[in-house]
Amino acid sequence: MTYDFGSLNNWGTLKKVALRTPAVAFHSDARIDSEWQKLNYHSRPDLDAAKQEFIAVEAILGKSGADVIRLPAGEGLTLDSLYTHDALVVTPRGLVRPRMGKPARRLEPRVNGAHLESLGIPVIGEIAAPGQLEGGDLVWIDRNTLLAGIGYRTNQEGIRQLSE
């Protein structure tokens, strides 16, 4: 069975998008101070600026007609949970929970998947160790063609599991 998730590419009309707000992902300046260097950020995020940028982006998405789904906080998530594209893999049949290459991000797919599943979006699979796969390394060309980059976040085993 296939579902209409809209465009499975990076240039078509965006119908639905799942985002986590900076207020949820970053939570507080204290949390930013405790995590940003451990997570290898180049500089310290500015919580207030990030919140303002998010409001602007969300307004643009809303004006374009996209349905914005706000992802919740989750125990053990880090600042990186703001970058939702990495921790979500959408296919024509539903979501696949990836296995993040960065160990600090491994809880994100479960939290994201559980929330989206509660909204009626099916979770059809999960990448298991030793596979690694991140949405940021994947680009849909059309509904049947997916390009995958192999590197420290996505490996051949993760791609093999996704292809099943």
Which stretches of residues belong to each language-model region?
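The feature marks the mature, well-folded catalytic cores of soluble enzymes
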Residues: M1-E164
